């Protein structure tokens, strides 16, 4: 259904944002941006 598709998309986007956030934080911490 459309709803489950939206939920799957939101979960995927959330994981990507978390990954990007973690990479950004590590980059800031090591000052290698």
Swiss-Prot record:
Natural source organism: Glandirana rugosa
Expression across tissues: Expressed by the skin glands.
Pfam families: Antimicrobial_2
GO cellular component: extracellular region
Quaternary assembly: Monomer.
Cell compartment(s), UniProt: Secreted
Record's keyword terms, sorted: Amphibian defense peptide, Antibiotic, Antimicrobial, Disulfide bond, Secreted
UniProt name for this protein: Gaegurin-1
Function, in words: Has a non-hemolytic activity. Has a broad spectrum of activity against both Gram-positive and Gram-negative bacteria, fungi and protozoa.
GO BP, one annotated term: defense response to bacterium
Gene field: GGN1
Disulfide cysteine pairs (residue numbers): 27-33
Family according to the record: Belongs to the frog skin active peptide (FSAP) family. Brevinin subfamily.
Chief location bin: secreted
């Amino acid at each position: 259904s459309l709803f489950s598709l939206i939920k799957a998309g939101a979960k995927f986007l959330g994981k990507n944002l978390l990954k990007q956030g973690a990479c950004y934080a590590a980059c800031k911490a090591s000052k290698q941006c």
